[in-house]
Amino acid sequence: MTHILVVDNHGQFTHLEHRLLRDMDGVTVDLTDNTTPPADIDADGLVLSGGPTMADIGHCREYLTLDVPILGVCLGHQLIADELGGRIEAGDYGGYADVTVSISDADDPLVGSLAPDTRVWASHADEVVAVPDGFTITAESDICGVEAMGDTDRDLYGVQWHPEVAHTEEGEAVFENFVAICE
C-alpha cells in the first residue's frame, strides 16, 4: 500500500483531495494539519493542499526538505515555487474559472497523460510567474503561464488548478499519476 499524507493548509477543497485518494485502490491516506512537526511525517508522498494565504502554511516550507515526492495544489504549488527560488505574483484574472490547460510536456509523469490539453477548475488570485531552478513548466493556459511545473529529479510537482473538484475533467488522473510517482 502506498501511504499519502494530505497536508491541510485550510483550503476549502482539502477534504476532496483526501476523499479522492482514499477511494483509490492500493492507497492509504491520512489528513494532517500543516502544524505537524516534520519529524512526525511518515508517508510515501505528500499533497500540500490549497489554502487562503501564505501566512498560514505552518511547517510546509520544512516539508520540502523531506525525501518524499510532493504535489502542491494551488497554494501548495505557489509555496513550492516561492520557497525554492521561483516567483509568485497576483494573477491578472483572479477568482475561480473553467480553464483549458495545454500540456507542454507530454512525458511529464504527473500531467503528461493529460496531453494535449484538459479542462480544469482553477483559481488565479495568485500564481507562479517564474519557476525555480530545476523545474520545468509542464502546463500553461491563456490566463496563466505556469499552470503546472515539475522537478523530476527531486519528485516535486505543482498544479495551479484543483484536480480534486468535479469541474476538473481529468483530476483523478493527476492523483493516480502522483501515486505512481510515490510507489
UniProtKB/Swiss-Prot annotation:
Keyword tags: ATP-binding, Glutamine amidotransferase, GMP biosynthesis, Ligase, Nucleotide-binding, Purine biosynthesis
Record-annotated Glutamine amidotransferase type-1 domain positions: 3-183
CDD domains reported in the protein's UniProt record: GATase1_GMP_Synthase
Catalysed reactions, as listed in the record: XMP + L-glutamine + ATP + H2O = GMP + L-glutamate + AMP + diphosphate + 2 H(+)
A molecular function (GO) term: ATP binding
Keyword Ligase tagged: yes
EC numbers: 6.3.5.2
Pfam family of the protein (one): GATase
SUPFAM superfamilies linked to this entry: Class I glutamine amidotransferase-like (SSF52317)
NCBIfam families membership: guaA_Nterm, PRK00758.1
Subunit structure as annotated in this protein's UniProt entry: Heterodimer composed of a glutamine amidotransferase subunit (A) and a GMP-binding subunit (B).
Function (record text): Catalyzes the synthesis of GMP from XMP.
Protein name in UniProt: GMP synthase [glutamine-hydrolyzing] subunit A
Gene behind the chain: guaAA
